[in-house]
């Protein structure tokens, strides 16, 4: 009998697990309008600069500027994700929170292999994060360390490690180990200059030099520097140093962008080998900023890899995406190549992206003219890679290329202007572009001459972006676009003449995001208002007032329960279970935990007006998980907090309706949401 009971219990557990797993596989996860399918985005909320890029123990760490309580830039934290392949990402909890020294601005992370800091406590090498803290505009540099592969972090008791020397803008430290002199080197943005510091232990830093006066572009404040060495044309005996700098305004295509310098670094000073007024732009699009490279890539790999923030400070806060805002670019490999005009940085997509290709389509030796039938008329998609090689001569079409994400009155042109020898992206007809007047500025161009009579285009299209690599990455254009979901067409075109296409391959690219981490035995969740998202903590809702989401399930008598956590963010208000609701959440019952007023409350909405039925006074803390359960039978309602009966009340206004969730003046998360009839 005991054995039979154990078997039944095991079977019940398996069935329950299967039910949760099936319900968790909600196809709506990472499927909102404009949601990138293979680019990194946070599950919810605002993101900007990538930070703390470090590789350790088989994982690429991506930290990023993150506002957990809003869709616009706000109090900065470090969000965190890891990847084993640069393609699929695992979301992790926030790594660094603001403290009395300020919010957490951009910075870097390193593996302290020799334990120079003395932070190591176990067998794992310490990861050390170096970041800016901003308190009401006063910026200093601080550090934190991790002894568990970056899962938890301890802030150094001696912070800040570099106090402010009297500069308004003093931020974004990028640190690397300089093996030749066995020391750490930091590059730090200060106004429109880069300051260089050195250290033996990551805790005490010495000022070494300054770079930037009268060098390159000074259209805006300099930010997010990086400094690294690369071989020229792969020759290990010929190496040069690259200084990458983000510029807050005045970039080549308007607004924020990136420039770089090529030269020499002797351990304390960087020297630009080009004329001071020569500006080398990293990307000619509107939407590539704050890119920094991963540190500690193994010598067996030796690639210099990075990614950037795909947005522009002119309109970043207004881009109409929800429940998240902003994406990173695809990861790219950086190389130095010698051209007739000098040594230049080239960027190519990482080879790992080839693993998400679907069934490819190929064409060879096509001739395209304005009168040609669109050979790509049968192609449809919103996430794909294009590889094309065109033969170009003085008699070729004046313009040729692709129209991607085409639909009714929508398309984005990615092409080549032969007469002016320019690669271009034109998003003026790409879709939603009225949210900010700075967004639709027409065509972005990059100088690109044919090589041996050929022009190569490699184009990555996602639901809200295009990244174009011309002639094996010599020039790059990165732009976000916002077409309708239905705009999935593709066209190969030529204007004012014909052009020969030597080869063309289109690779569909697969979605890299898996099943939702939100656990519930109900489906069909539909947002009524506010901002809702599935996150690693559960279903997150955020609103300054009342916000609702409803499932497709309904009932009259039931047990309905959930884990609820009110986050320490905007409002510190309440999270609620809603039941017997109408389809608009204007009428129905709610049971909540209220951190603002320290109570559990049972109330109802009648035509949108709230009235309290019963309440129980008890401390409700933010960032603490509570289990709230409601039992409904006829007109009687029992409400339990952490399995303790706190309210037993009667009301007969509503007899049945839908199940849902509510937040009021808060960011709250709900997990393990279940109902039993």
UniProtKB/Swiss-Prot annotation:
EC annotation from Swiss-Prot or TrEMBL: 3.2.1.80
Major location category of this protein: secreted
SUPFAM superfamilies tied to this protein: Arabinanase/levansucrase/invertase, Concanavalin A-like lectins/glucanases
Induction summary: Induced by low concentrations of fructose, but not by sucrose. Repressed by glucose or high concentrations of fructose.
Active-site residues from the entry: 49
Pfam family, one: Glyco_hydro_32N
Binding site for substrate: 46-49, 65, 73, 105-106, 171-172, 223, 313
Signal sequence segment: 1-24
GO molecular function: fructan beta-fructosidase activity; sucrose alpha-glucosidase activity
Keywords, sorted A to Z: Carbohydrate metabolism, Glycosidase, Hydrolase, Secreted, Signal
Disulfide bonds: none
pH dependence: Optimum pH is 5.5 for inulin hydrolysis.
Temperature dependence: Optimum temperature is 55 degrees Celsius for inulin hydrolysis. Is rapidly inactivated at 60 degrees Celsius. High stable at 50 and 55 degrees Celsius.
Location of the protein in the cell: Secreted
GO biological process, one term: sucrose catabolic process
GO cellular component, one term: cytoplasm
Keyword Hydrolase: yes
Family per record: Belongs to the glycosyl hydrolase 32 family.
Note: Levanase cannot be detected in the wild-type B.subtilis but is mostly secreted into the culture medium by SacL mutants, especially at the end of the exponential growth phase.
Record protein name field: Levanase
């Amino acid at each position: 009998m005991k054995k039979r009971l154990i078997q039944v219990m095991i079977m019940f557990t398996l069935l329950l697990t299967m039910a949760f797993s099936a319900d968790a596989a909600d196809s709506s996860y990472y499927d909102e309008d404009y949601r990138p399918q293979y680019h990194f985005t946070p599950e919810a909320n605002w993101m900007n600069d990538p930070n703390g890029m470090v590789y350790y123990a088989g994982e690429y760490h991506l930290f990023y500027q993150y506002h957990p309580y809003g869709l616009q830039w706000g109090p900065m934290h470090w969000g965190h994700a890891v990847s084993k392949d640069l393609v699929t990402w695992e979301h992790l909890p926030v790594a660094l929170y603001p403290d009395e020294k300020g919010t957490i601005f951009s910075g870097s992370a390193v593996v302290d292999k020799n334990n120079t800091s003395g932070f190591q406590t176990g067998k794992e090498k310490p990861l050390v994060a170096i970041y800016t803290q901003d308190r009401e505009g006063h910026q200093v540099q601080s550090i934190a360390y991790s002894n568990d592969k970056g899962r938890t972090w301890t802030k150094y008791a001696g912070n800040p490690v570099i106090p402010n020397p009297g500069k308004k803008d003093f931020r974004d430290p990028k640190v690397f180990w300089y093996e030749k002199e066995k020391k750490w080197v930091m590059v730090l943005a200060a106004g429109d200059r880069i300051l260089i510091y050195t250290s033996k232990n990551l805790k005490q830093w010495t000022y070494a030099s300054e770079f930037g006066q009268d060098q390159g572009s000074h259209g805006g404040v300099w930010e997010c520097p990086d400094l690294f060495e690369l071989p020229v044309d792969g020759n290990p005996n010929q190496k040069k140093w690259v200084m990458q700098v983000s510029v807050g305004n005045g970039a080549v295509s308007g607004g924020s962008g990136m420039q770089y310098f090529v030269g020499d670094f002797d351990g304390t000073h960087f020297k630009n080998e080009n004329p001071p007024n020569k500006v080398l732009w990293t990307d000619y699009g509107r939407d590539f900023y704050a890119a920094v490279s991963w540190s500690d890539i193994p010598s067996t790999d030796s690639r210099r890899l990075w990614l950037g923030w795909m947005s522009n400070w002119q309109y970043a806060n207004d881009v109409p995406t929800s429940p998240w805002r902003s994406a990173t670019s695809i990861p790219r490999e950086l190389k130095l190549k010698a051209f007739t005009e000098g040594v230049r940085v080239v960027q190519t997509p990482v080879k790992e992206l080839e693993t998400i290709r679907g069934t490819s389509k190929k064409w060879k030796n096509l001739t395209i003219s304005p009168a040609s039938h669109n050979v790509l008329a049968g192609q449809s998609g919103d996430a794909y890679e294009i590889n094309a090689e065109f033969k170009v001569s003085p008699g070729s079409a004046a313009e040729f290329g692709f129209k991607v994400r085409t639909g009714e009155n929508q398309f984005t042109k990615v092409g080549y202007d032969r007469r002016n020898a320019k690669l271009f992206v034109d998003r003026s007809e790409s879709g939603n572009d009225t949210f900010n007047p700075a967004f639709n500025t027409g065509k972005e161009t990059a100088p690109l001459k044919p090589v041996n009579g050929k022009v190569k285009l490699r184009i990555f299209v996602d639901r809200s972006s295009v990244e174009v690599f011309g002639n094996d990455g010599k020039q790059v254009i990165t732009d976000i676009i916002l077409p309708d979901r239905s705009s999935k067409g593709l066209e190969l075109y030529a204007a004012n003449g014909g052009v020969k296409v030597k080869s063309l391959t289109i690779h569909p690219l697969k979605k890299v995001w898996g099943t939702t981490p939100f656990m519930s035995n109900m489906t069909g969740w539909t947002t009524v208002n506010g901002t809702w998202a599935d996150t690693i903590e559960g279903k997150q809702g955020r609103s300054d007032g009342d916000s609702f989401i409803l499932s497709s399930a309904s009932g009259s008598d039931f047990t309905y329960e959930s884990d609820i956590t009110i986050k320490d963010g905007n409002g510190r208000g309440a999270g609620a279970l809603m039941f017997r609701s109408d389809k608009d959440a204007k009428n129905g019952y709610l049971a909540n935990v209220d951190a603002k007023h320290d109570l559990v409350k049972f109330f109802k909405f009648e035509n949108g007006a709230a009235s309290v039925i019963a309440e129980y006074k008890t401390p409700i803390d933010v960032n603490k998980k509570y289990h709230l359960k409601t039992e409904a039978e006829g007109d009687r309602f029992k409400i339990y907090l952490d399995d303790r009966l706190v309210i037993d009340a009667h009301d007969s206004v509503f007899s049945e309706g839908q199940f849902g969730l509510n937040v009021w003046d808060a960011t709250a998360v709900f997990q393990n949401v279940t109902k039993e009839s």
